[in-house]
């Protein structure tokens, strides 16, 4: 109530001292401030149950750090940029975002950036999208000791390189592949698996490209099972022997490795990677309702693409989500073969996206362009006079700043720029 009283007093004071356009600018800023403090549904859920999460779930430091970031994402008191129109005095404050992959807004932006970076690596050939899954009995080992997730990457990398080495005659053909770790299934439960984008061909040491159209999935399944179980046995020790023996017995044909039915064409590579490899754990659009105690969300079941809606207790929903937050500095995306090395001979390869086009692709990921393409309006065009707004002030380091001071400084700069225009 004190803040709203301050606003009313401030507007009355301004009415007698500045032109009406400046008053409209202040009101516009105030409305924008209120708009940006409307939380999305995930922020609301985690804010309502913050103490319960902290003191009953005992989250990992990485989980707590990302929860704090996500809750405060878009909070103007943590800093931002003030834009102003030098023609009419209209002001617009754009708060900084948290840049957490766990945040639905920033996670989507992160996915866009990573998708673009991955697409710049790809050679201009078809790529096969393979998914390497594990036995359900092994999942808890990766949950209890997250360093074991490295075994998944090592196993997939060794298997793909061995697959191509078996095809080699007298030349050493090396494929390029990108591995992306997903720890979630569509129902948000813990289900670590690797998505791997593999070039349909390999590059020899003497600059010769060999196309490969057939992948031996029998070999991939058996080799991946063997490589992973051996890696885990070395890491865990003798206590893992019984589990390993049971996996060999129950999966005599290897762990399930399958290919997506549609291949990754060079012309649509960015869209393909974004759809299958770059997606966040859950989008806010999949959360249907939140009552305070229960959360309803939906997904299409993997087995038959059947629409499924689940309603579960809110704390169960939170537990399902936060377990997918990786440890700090853990790499969820890794490159192998051609895409992991930097040799002068590899520069002869024709890339799917040329260096001349990369600037254009990066532009689509910028805040202003992304808003324009997604919502159809330019956020830096003044809604009153349709002129481009300019930046007046930046507050950073997520330190809290008094909004009255922010307003006074911004107005002072706005007057100075308009008088010199």
Language-model regions: role of each:
Residues 2, 14-16, 21-421:
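Beta->alpha loop/short-helix hinge microenvironment recognizer with preference
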Residues 4-6:
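Serine-biased, low-complexity intrinsically disordered segments, primarily in secretory-pathway proteins
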């Amino acid at each position: 109530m004190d803040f709203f009283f301050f606003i009313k007093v401030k507007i009355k004071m301004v009415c007698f001292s500045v032109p009406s356009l400046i008053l409209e600018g202040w009101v516009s800023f105030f409305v924008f401030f209120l708009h940006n403090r409307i939380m999305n549904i995930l922020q609301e859920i985690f804010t309502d149950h913050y103490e319960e999460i902290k003191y009953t779930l005992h989250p990992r430091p990485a989980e707590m750090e990302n929860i704090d970031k996500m809750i405060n994402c878009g909070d103007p008191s943590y800093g931002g940029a003030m834009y102003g129109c030098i023609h009419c005095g209209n002001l617009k404050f754009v708060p900084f975002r948290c840049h957490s992959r766990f945040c639905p807004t920033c996670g989507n932006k992160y996915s866009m950036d990573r998708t673009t970076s991955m697409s710049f690596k790809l050679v201009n050939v078809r790529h096969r999208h393979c998914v390497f899954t594990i036995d359900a009995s092994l999942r808890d080992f990766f949950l209890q000791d997250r360093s074991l997730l490295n075994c998944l990457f090592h196993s997939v990398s060794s298997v793909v390189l061995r697959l191509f080495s078996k095809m080699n005659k007298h030349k050493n053909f090396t494929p390029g592949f990108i591995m992306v770790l997903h720890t979630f299934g569509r129902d948000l439960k813990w289900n670590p698996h690797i998505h791997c984008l593999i070039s349909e061909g390999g590059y020899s040491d003497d600059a010769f490209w060999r196309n490969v159209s057939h992948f031996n999935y029998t070999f991939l399944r058996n080799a991946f099972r063997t490589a992973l179980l051996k890696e885990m046995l070395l890491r865990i020790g003798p206590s893992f022997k019984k589990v390993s023996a049971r996996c060999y017995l129950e999966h005599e044909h290897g762990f399930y490795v399958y290919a997506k039915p549609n291949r990754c064409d060079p012309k649509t590579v960015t869209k393909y990677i974004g759809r299958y490899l770059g997606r966040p754990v859950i989008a806010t659009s999949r959360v249907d309702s939140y009552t305070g105690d229960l959360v309803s969300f939906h997904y299409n079941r993997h087995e038959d693409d059947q629409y499924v809606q689940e309603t579960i207790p809110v704390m169960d929903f939170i537990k399902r989500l936060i377990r997918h937050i990786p440890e700090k500095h853990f790499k969820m995306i890794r490159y192998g073969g051609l895409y992991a090395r930097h040799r002068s001979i590899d520069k002869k390869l024709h890339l799917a996206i040329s260096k001349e086009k990369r600037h254009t692709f990066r532009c689509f990921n910028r805040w202003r362009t992304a808003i324009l393409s997604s919502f159809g309006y330019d956020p830096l065009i003044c809604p009153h006079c349709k002129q481009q707004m300019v930046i007046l002030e930046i507050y950073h380091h997520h330190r809290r700043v008094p909004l009255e001071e922010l307003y006074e400084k911004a107005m002072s700069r706005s007057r100075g720029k308009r008088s010199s225009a």
